[in-house]
Amino acid sequence: MSARHKDPRLTARPRQPNETAPRGAVSLGSDKVRGGILYVPEQYHPTAPAPLIVALHGGGGQARSWERLYEPCEEHGIVLLAPESRGRTWDAIQGMFGPDVVFLDSALEYVFARCAINPKKIALAGFSDGASYALSLGPSNGDLFSELIAFSPGFSYPEEPIIGRPKVFISHGTEDRVLPVSLSRDGIAPMFDMDGYTIRYEEFTGGHEMPPEVVTKALDWFLGSEP
């Protein structure tokens, strides 16, 4: 594991699947081992590569927190991968990119072996701690992720190398008492803007949450964004 310490690069890439894709929600773990969930919409067909959203839960969370996306993924033909962190939080907050990067890479390999994915439509998304991880890991993998979606992030600590410029969507509640809106408004969003990223920043009246209307805006932005 030490060889991957502070290594943010993901190596898995979309390819021609050689295994049959499941349909619906499939667990990637067990009752004793944290894993994640793969959701494949019924309309998926291997001859039509699908968009992919990789969704990262908040601190102490689980993959099932993203079940709210099943319906829009079904509607729009999006494949959803919701991996789970190896510990309570994603490992960027611990000052390294290690076990979580390795697991995420293996989870992506699992998806790419089963699902035909559009390489120009892969988003890394997250809420809270997961949003911070998306904004930290994403800049080093701009050759894989076309978009980054961050709901109520707290920080962005990217590591070299910085590759590509994925488009960025950030939302934050003006009444957030867990991670104040100023973190995004005055820090994270301006930083990405100054670094040359195309960014959409949304504030909403509310707390530390993902209101349905904001999630809809993010998905519409993802699907409508030009490659």
Feature locations, PLM:
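Primarily recognizes the serine-hydrolase "nucleophile elbow" in alpha/beta-hydrolase
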Residues: 112-114, 120-165
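Histidine-bearing beta->alpha loop at or near hydrolase active sites
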Residues: 87, 201-210
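Serine-hydrolase catalytic machinery in alpha/beta-hydrolase-like enzymes
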Residues: 13-43, 47-116
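Short, proline-enriched alpha-helix->beta-strand connector loops that line the catalytic pocket
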Residues: 163-168, 195-197
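Short beta-strand/loop motif that positions the catalytic acidic residue
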Residues: 169-172, 176
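Short alpha-helix in the alpha/beta-hydrolase fold that links the catalytic acid
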Residues: 68, 180-190
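A domain-start/cap signature at the N-terminus of enzymes
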Residues: 1-51, 96-99, 125-132, 137, ...
